Amino acid sequence: MERIIMHIDLDAFFASVEQRDNPKLKGKPVIVGGTSGRGVVATASYEARKYGVHSAMPVFMARKKCPYGIYVASRHDRYREVSKNIFKIFYEITEVVEPVSIDEAYLDITNCGKEPLKVVDYIKKEIWKRERLTASIGISYNKFLAKLASDWNKPNGIKIIKKDMIPDILLPLSINKVHGMGKKSVKKMNNIGVFKIEDMYKLPLDLFIEYFGKFGLEIYEKIRGIDNREVEVGRERKSIGNETTLRKDTKDIEEIKKYLYSFSKSISKGLRKNHMWGKTVTVKIKNYKFEITTKSKTLKEYINEEEKIYIEACKILDSINIKDPLRLIGLTLSNLSEIKIEQLTIEQLMNSQRS
């Protein structure tokens, strides 16, 4: 049986919540994420996107493109509350749900016993009825094509991609539409005269392996409409972390460590709340030139205590040669486990074998 995979993307989610909660913002260019000019755009409303504003753009650039935009601070607790209510709708349809982020999910509706378009109609109506928000939905026989379809008719769109539509749909597209093709990969392809999937389609498999390594086969198959990835139910959280843009650029290590301490406290709180521990500590810095450096350390034991997280973060920071003033600092704990796995010493191991 051919799978029926659905990708649901809530439209300009953070900005849409702000516009819904404050009717005065309706129809206006709303930019969520930073109000100081030193932050980064989390989400821009569709009205703001017309000016070229997009997520991950520095706020100072957004202000140049959209000087009359309305800049709103993020309210993550509010967004999580709304997201939770919407995800309940997905679970009413099927248990095979893979949350990708707070505003995005895959559903496998192959065995739910309902017509795909009726499922789409129900989901859209319920999201609007319960939260007065819209979503764009893509349907296909695999995850790659379902996501591609959900991007097709934004906002509030629906698109179905069937097997017999693949040549007409895929071949004319730019190669940056292929999930997994980052800026560097696109540039590599552009340098050899490959700009569209149609150009890429003509390349032999060994060239994909040469250019993309272990991802070569995956990309080769995707542009042929092949993607065997399953919808991952209950996908485990892989990391927890925080980052922030500093109020002003600084090389003051003690000032930077204050941020690491604050992050360590919030990370520890989140881990303990979910009864989790982590093993890999990563510090991320961005200087005033927007150059990013990340450095990680995998520990011998799992930790979730704020003091231990902070100590390891400081060790990593001290090992980085910081030449220029920083504008951003981040801290992440990954390699998570719901059980604190202890590393036994040889003596402990011998004792356990004797008992």
Show the residue positions of the predicted features:
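Gly/Gly-Pro- and Ser/Thr-rich, intrinsically disordered tail segments characteristic of DNA damage-repair
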Residues: 1-211, 216-217, 339-355
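DNA-contacting surface of Y-family translesion DNA polymerases
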Residues: 7, 190-328, 335-354
